[in-house]
Regions:
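Nucleotide-activated donor-binding/catalytic signature segment of Leloir-type glycosyltransferases, i.e.
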Residues: 240-260
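Acidic donor-binding loop of glycosyltransferase active sites
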Residues: 267-283, 293-294
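Short hydrophobic beta-strand element within catalytic cores of glycosyltransferases
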Residues: 294-303
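A short, histidine- and acid-enriched strand-loop-helix "catalytic/donor-clamping" loop
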Residues: 113-131, 142-145
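Conserved donor-binding/catalytic core segment of Leloir-type glycosyltransferases
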Residues: 21-23, 193-212, 218-222, 231-232
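Donor nucleotide-sugar binding/catalytic pocket of nucleotide-sugar-dependent glycosyltransferases
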Residues: 141-183, 193, 201
Length: 381
C-alpha cells in the first residue's frame, strides 16, 4: 500500500502545472505586491505559486491575488496542508526562533520534497554569534537550495554550498507604485509642509530598540535654525520621549501611512529632496532610490539592502553614530543642487537596474526549477 507521500509524488507527475509553496511567518504589507507579481509570473512559467503563513500584517491594505492560507504555526497542521498542496518545491521564509522550522524542514527532507531557505544567512545585527551561526550553518547544509537577499551574503556561506545558491536581490514591486502628477509644492501644501526642501525619514521606528536611529535626525533638526529645510518623519512607534525632543519649527511627524494604492506614501516621497535613515535602511532605501532621493545613512549593522548604496554615487555613508558627519552630509546635499541632482539620477538608475522585481523573481524561479529537476523519490514517513 502506498504511503501518503508516495501518492503525493504520483499526483505531481500527472499535473499540468508544477507547484511551489512559500511557507512564511508574518506576511508584511510590502510583500503582498511582491507575491502577487510572483504568482502571475510563476503561472506564465508553468508554475502555481502559493503562500502558507501564520498571519498577514494587520495594516495591509493591498489586495491579495495569490493563493494564501493563514493558520497558526503547528507542525501537524502544516504537514497536512503541505500534503494537500503537494508541492514540487517548498521555500521556507522563517526565523530561527520560529520553532516550526525545525520539524518542518526535516520532515520535508525525509519526505523527498525539495526545500529551499530564503535567508540573510546570518542575524546581521549580531553576525559573529557563534552559537546562532551554528544553527544557520546547519540549515544551510540541510537545505537543497538557498535564496539570498543579495550576492554579498555568500561570504557567510561555506563554499561547498555555492552550487545551491540563488540570488534574488531583495526589493519591492515598483510596478504597483502610482504615477504622481502633482508637483512637489502642491503635495507640500496638501500636507501642510512649509519647508522649501525636505529631508524624509521612513520606517518602523520602535522596531528592535530604535535601530533606525531616528533620534539622530531629531537631534540634528532640534539644533538647526533654518526655516527653509525641514524633517518629515513617517512611521509607527515614535515614543513620547522622542516626540518631546522634536523641534516643531522644522519637523513634522506624519505617523504611519498605509493605503491600498500606495498613493499617499508615493506623494510623500515625491515631495522630498533627500532621504535619511541613519540605521538599518531596509527596503526604505529601495523606495527612496526609486523616487530619486539620495540616501544619507551611517555605517554599522546594516541590512543586505545597504549593498545598493554606493558612497558618493547615489548617497552618502558616514561613520557609525557620527551625528556631526550625518548633519554635514545632509546640509551639503540640501545646499548643492547640482550634486543632489547627480546623486538623484544615479539612485533611480541603480535601483532599477540592480533591484527590479523581475530580477528578484528570476532568482526564485531559478531555485524552483533547480529543486524540481533534482526531486528525489520520497521515502516513507
Amino acid at each position: 500500500m502506498k504511503s501518503r507521500d508516495e501518492v503525493l509524488d504520483q499526483n505531481i507527475s500527472v499535473r499540468k502545472h508544477r507547484r511551489v509553496l512559500l511557507i512564511s511567518n508574518r506576511v508584511m504589507h510590502y510583500r503582498v505586491s511582491v507575491y502577487n507579481y510572483f504568482w502571475r509570473r510563476f503561472r506564465q512559467e508553468g508554475w502555481e505559486f502559493s503562500v502558507l503563513a501564520n498571519e498577514l500584517q494587520k495594516q495591509n491594505q493591498n489586495r491579495v491575488d495569490f493563493p494564501f492560507t493563514e493558520m497558526p504555526f503547528d507542525f501537524f497542521a502544516y504537514r497536512k496542508q503541505v500534503r494537500a498542496i503537494a508541492p514540487d518545491a517548498v521555500i521556507l521564509f522563517l526565523h530561527l526562533k520560529d520553532r516550526i522550522i525545525w520539524p518542518l524542514a526535516h520532515w520535508l527532507k525525509f519526505s523527498g520534497v525539495p526545500v529551499a531557505i530564503w535567508t540573510k544567512t546570518r542575524n546581521l545585527d549580531d553576525p559573529d554569534n557563534r552559537v546562532r551561526n551554528a544553527f544557520f550553518d546547519y540549515l544551510h547544509n540541510l537545505a537543497d537550495g538557498l535564496i539570498l537577499y543579495t550576492d554579498n551574503l555568500r561570504r557567510y556561506v561555506s563554499p561547498r554550498h555555492f552550487s545551491k545558491l540563488f540570488v534574488a536581490n531583495n526589493t519591492i514591486n515598483f510596478h504597483d507604485f502610482p504615477e504622481v502628477l502633482e508637483s512637489k509644492e502642491q503635495i507640500k501644501e496638501s500636507f501642510g509642509i512649509p519647508f522649501r526642501k525636505v529631508v524624509l525619514f521612513t520606517g518602523r521606528i520602535g522596531e528592535e530598540g530604535n535601530r533606525k536611529k531616528v533620534d539622530h535626525l531629531i537631534d540634528i533638526f532640534r539644533e538647526l535654525d533654518r526655516p527653509d529645510l525641514g524633517l518629515v518623519i513617517v512611521g509607527s512607534g515614535l515614543t513620547e520621549a522622542l516626540r518631546s525632543r522634536i523641534n516643531p519649527k522644522n519637523t513634522r511627524y506624519l505617523g504611519e501611512v498605509h493605503d491600498p494604492r500606495n498613493s499617499q506614501i508615493s506623494r510623500i516621497f515625491k515631495m522630498a529632496d533627500i532621504c535619511s535613515i541613519p540605521g538599518h535602511v531596509g527596503l526604505g532605501l529601495n523606495q527612496a532610490f526609486y523616487w530619486g532621493l539620495p540616501m544619507v545613512t551611517e555605517a554599522g549593522k546594516q541590512p543586505p539592502e545597504i549593498d545598493y548604496l554606493e558612497d558618493g554615487r547615489n548617497g552618502y555613508m558616514v561613520p557609525e553614530n557620527d551625528v556631526a558627519a550625518l548633519r554635514q552630509r545632509i546640509l551639503y546635499l540640501a545646499d548643492n543642487d547640482d550634486e543632489r541632482k547627480r546623486l538623484s539620477a544615479n539612485a533611480r538608475q541603480d535601483i532599477l537596474s540592480r533591484a527590479s522585481i523581475e530580477s528578484m523573481f528570476g532568482g526564485f524561479l531559478a531555485c524552483a526549477e533547480s529543486l524540481a529537476s533534482a526531486r528525489r523519490h520520497p521515502t516513507k514517513s
